[in-house]
Each structure stands twice: as C-alpha cells, then as structure tokens.
Amino acid sequence: MAAITFHLDVVSAEKKLFSGRAESVQVSGSEGELGIHAGHTPLLTAITPGMVRIIKQHGEEEIIYLSGGMLEVQPSTVTVLTDTAIRGEDLDAAKAAEAKRQAEEQIRNQHGDIDFAQAASDLAKAIAQLRVIELTKKSR
C-alpha cells in the first residue's frame, strides 16, 4: 500500500531546493523538533538554524541545512521558507568547523565591539551545518 503524501516546497532566497511529494518532514522549530505528516493541522511557525529531513514519496531521505526561517503547513501543502538552504552533500565540513571555531573564539574573548548575539547565532549555524554533514554521511 502506498504511503499518504503531501506536496513539499523548500525555498531559499536564491532557489527552490525541493519541490515534490513527501511522506514526512522534520524541522527544528522555535519550540523544539517538529514532525509533519499528511493531514497535519495547519500551522505557521518560525524554524531555527538546523535541518529539514525529508522522507520522499518512496521512502528516500534527503537532508538540507537551513539557516532558519518559516514553516507553513496547509491541508495538502507544506512550505519551508529560509534565507539559506544547502543540501547536506554540498556542505563543506572544514569551512563549517572553522566557522564554529571562530564563533567560539568570539564568545570567549568578548570585547565591546563584538556582538554576542551575532556570535551565538553564527555558532548555532555552524553546529547545525556540522550535524547535517554528519547525518548525510550516515545516510549514504
């Protein structure tokens, strides 16, 4: 028996990264992890830097890094809007690790001209990218 699906769009400021049928989607919401399946109650919520894990129509998994954004759930359509979205296999582990190191350094060595909130945001994004890279490697 075929799984019940819904239409999913993952759209960044630059391009549409995914548009198709999905069995489920998992994102990091502002209130915690969200799992969306067909028939989910309509919802509009902020999403935090992290990933969107898509289970496509025939069970294939795709993981995409998101810099944060919005998630909208309608009866037959789910839309993820984000400033930055990068497929897990396209992320650069060395670059993400360096960004994490730099953000940690900025937080440790705070001076008047360093914006703590920006450094914390950069750290969260780098950690999220490293997590997506790790999960992408495991799913191959």
Curated annotation (Swiss-Prot):
In the bilayer, the protein is annotated as: Peripheral membrane protein
Q: Where in the cell is it found?
A: Cell inner membrane
Major location, coarse class?
A: membrane
Per UniProt, what is one Pfam family of this protein?
Answer: ATP-synt_DE_N
UniProt entry keywords in alphabetical sequence: ATP synthesis, Cell inner membrane, Cell membrane, CF(1), Hydrogen ion transport, Ion transport, Membrane, Transport
Q: Look up the record and report any one GO term of the cellular component aspect.
A: plasma membrane
Q: Does the keyword Cell inner membrane apply?
A: yes
Q: Tell me the GO molecular function terms.
A: ATP binding; proton-transporting ATP synthase activity, rotational mechanism
Family in the record:
Belongs to the ATPase epsilon chain family.
What does this protein do, in the record's words?
A: Produces ATP from ADP in the presence of a proton gradient across the membrane.
Kindly state the subunit structure of this protein: F-type ATPases have 2 components, CF(1) - the catalytic core - and CF(0) - the membrane proton channel. CF(1) has five subunits: alpha(3), beta(3), gamma(1), delta(1), epsilon(1). CF(0) has three main subunits: a, b and c.
Instruction: List the protein's name.
Output: ATP synthase epsilon chain 1
Give the source species: Photobacterium profundum (strain SS9)
Query: Could you read off the lineage of the organism from its UniProt record?
Result: Bacteria, Pseudomonadati, Pseudomonadota, Gammaproteobacteria, Vibrionales
